[in-house]
Amino acid sequence: MESLHRLRQFDAYPKTLEDFRVKTCGGALVTVISGLIMLILFFSELQYYLTKEIYPELFVDKSRGDKLKINIDVIFPHMPCAYLSIDAMDVAGEQQLDVEHNLFKQRLDKDKKPVTSEADRHELGKSEEHVVFDPKSLDPNRCESCYGAETDDFSCCNTCDDVREAYRRRGWAFKTPDSIEQCKREGFSQKMQEQKNEGCQVYGFLEVNKVAGNFHFAPGKSFQQSHVHVHDLQSFGLDNINMTHEIRHLSFGRDYPGLVNPLDGSSVAAMQSSMMFQYFVKIVPTVYVKVDGEVLRTNQFSVTRHEKMTNGLIGDQGLPGVFVLYELSPMMVKLTEKHRSFTHFLTGVCAIIGGVFTVAGLIDSLVYYSTRAIQKKIELGKAT
């Protein structure tokens, strides 16, 4: 009993008898408010605990031979699909001018609604080809005229594109498609006129080498001439080229939680005709490791935009269109998901309860003793 009596001396929470306790309305109000505050802060701490923590790390990118996937969804409200070509090239010298897969063009009306029920697949760098004649009716061994543009290695022009290519090799302007039988047969002029007031949506993805390069959207047929990439714009009027565009989505690789693509939802209006828009993109290779161990290899990027007026078809002034020029950072970012510490959560909850309880006690004491002091003064005033 002696030891128990000594132990009681260490009690930091002495109790008072029920008869000596005073309960007030002010104390009840403080208790209710402090309880609600504790409840709100508890759920806030719980929500914070349940969210995953991201730990960033920085490494030198040692990956080699990988491909870079470029996801594209861009709308050109004033550029018909028949006029638009998309090309990709890199510093290693690889060019993609005739890609058939993974990229689509959708014709749009003035309200940006699809003209057809489904998107047509196109080759990058080529205009649409709607065959309006029966190919079986033509001799497969035929050799049609190139209208004076024949060469030793290019003597037959059986399609409108063949004639355009022959003219291009000669350096001639392709201005009179209606006088060329192949183009008349394929309805080249009708197709161009039919889409004159339409827009175009380009969507899909490209796979390129993981080196610096660019891809661009520009009017006219693209080709190489003396190791220079050019577009045939001689059949277009520069005053008719409106490169207003809306980038609905542009990313380099797979999405991961929290990824922000800075160009998504951006819209740029061309204030003049024949504008050249350049997007300079810095790509940072990124590895995202989920809590379950799944690894996502992707990229994040930053971008700056530059625009200028072009006055020439070919030359130092540039080409009208939208150009995305990208380069890769030598550093790699690794983002690792981890669960938050339960002990940290427990510490936070204890701090919330103890802190609110202590502050509430101080407020209650202040209110109680202030009220008593005022009441005593009032009573003394009445007595005198």
From Swiss-Prot:
Membrane topology classification: Multi-pass membrane protein
Organism annotation: Xenopus tropicalis (Western clawed frog)
Cellular location(s): Endoplasmic reticulum-Golgi intermediate compartment membrane; Golgi apparatus, cis-Golgi network membrane; Endoplasmic reticulum membrane
Intervals, Lumenal compartment: 47-342
GO cellular component: endoplasmic reticulum membrane; endoplasmic reticulum-Golgi intermediate compartment membrane; Golgi apparatus
Pfam families recorded: COPIIcoated_ERV, ERGIC_N
Annotated protein name in UniProt: Endoplasmic reticulum-Golgi intermediate compartment protein 3
Family: Belongs to the ERGIC family.
Entry-linked InterPro entries: Erv, Erv_C, Erv_N
Residues that span the membrane, as ranges: 26-46, 343-363
UniProt keyword list: Endoplasmic reticulum, ER-Golgi transport, Golgi apparatus, Membrane, Transmembrane, Transmembrane helix, Transport
Species lineage: Eukaryota, Metazoa, Chordata, Craniata, Vertebrata
Keyword Transmembrane helix set for record: yes
Cytoplasmic side: 1-25, 364-384
GO biological process, one term: intracellular transport
Function statement: Possible role in transport between endoplasmic reticulum and Golgi.
